[in-house]
Design a protein with these regions (language model features):
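Conserved glycine-rich cofactor-binding loop
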Residues: 9, 16-17
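Conserved glycine-rich Rossmann-like NAD(P)H-binding loop of the short-chain dehydrogenase/reductase
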Residues: 30-47
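Active-site helix of classical SDR
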Residues: 121, 156
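Substrate-binding pocket helix/loop in short-chain dehydrogenase/reductase
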Residues: 97-98, 102-107
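SDR active-site lid
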Residues: 173-237
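Residue(s) in the substrate-gating loop at a strand-loop-helix junction
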Residues: 140
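The beta1-alpha1 cofactor-binding region of Rossmann-like NAD(H)/NADP(H)-dependent oxidoreductases
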Residues: 60-71, 103
Length: 269
């Protein structure tokens, strides 16, 4: 990778683990200055201890709270003076049939996945405009094709992509690059922490994490997509097929998706 990220100030939400942590691990050797946030003080402290001699700024933040997002962005600006790239990575998933799920599941998922991105982008936007910077949303194939058992998650990703497309158009003349990335199934904690029907962490993954793309590989794809100024990037071949089939043959896509997630009438994935 070129010197594109050298001395760039990159703000990443949800950087204490998973894809966010992998992005930090990849960006630090490239000479980027990084600000990140997460809900866990301990995880952020461990991250800070891992990188004691680099430009890494961490802030305990719950992105579902607008004031927390404002403080994270302001703290980043106070520390580095500006923001070149904002990666809205923080996210939460869910696993429950709609008929069983409490409506609080929808509120919590939307608050993190959609409104967290809106809040951080809103407060970072003046700096991003002045720097002709980059806004990135970490989305999912669920932003193209609604997934059973993930209705709230799918809704949040459809909302994210629609909003990003709208502001991309608004910001065209201001030279701010807006994009989203759909990683596909990536080995991380997101399925363990996914909300159940009662809006509580389900505590275990229902899928084989070892067969998935690694967070490090995902981060590499994301950074290359940013450098190439892509409008969007779907990272796995399977997800590219899903998007294409859903666009061209939606009824067939319904059946294929149902058969993947259900066995014997029960949600198994």
């Amino acid at each position: 990778m070129s010197s594109f990220f050298t001395n760039k100030v990159v703000a990443i939400t949800g950087g204490s683990e998973g894809i966010g942590k992998a992005l930090i691990d990849a960006l630090i050797p490239l000479g980027a200055k990084i600000a990140t946030c997460g809900r866990s003080f301990d995880k952020l402290y461990n991250l800070q201890m891992q990188y004691t001699n680099v430009m890494l700024h961490t802030v305990v933040t719950d992105v579902s709270k607008e004031e927390d997002c404002r403080k994270f962005i302001q703290s980043t600006l106070d520390t580095f003076g500006h923001i070149d790239i904002l990666i809205n990575n923080a996210g939460v998933s869910m696993r429950a049939l709609f008929e069983d799920a409490d409506t609080d599941v929808f509120r919590k998922v939307m608050d993190v996945n959609f409104f967290g991105s809106v809040y951080c982008t809103k407060y970072a936007l003046p700096s991003l405009i002045s720097r002709q910077g980059v806004i990135v949303g970490i989305s999912s194939v669920a932003g193209y094709r609604g997934l059973p058992g993930r209705s709230a998650y799918s809704a949040s990703k459809f909302a994210l992509q629609g909003w990003l497309e709208a502001i991309r158009t608004e910001l065209l003349e201001k030279q701010v690059h807006v994009m989203w990335v759909s990683p596909g199934f990536t080995a991380s904690n997101i399925r363990v922490a996914a909300l159940d029907a009662n809006a509580q962490s389900q505590g275990a993954s229902t899928m084989d994490e070892t067969a998935m793309m690694s967070a490090a590989e995902c981060a590499d794809h994301i950074l290359r997509a940013i450098e190439k100024r892509k409008r969007s990037a779907v990272l796995t071949l399977n997800d590219k097929r899903t998007v294409l089939v859903n666009r061209l043959f939606p009824s067939w896509a319904d059946k294929l998706t149902h058969n993947f997630f259900f066995k014997g009438g029960k949600l198994v994935k």
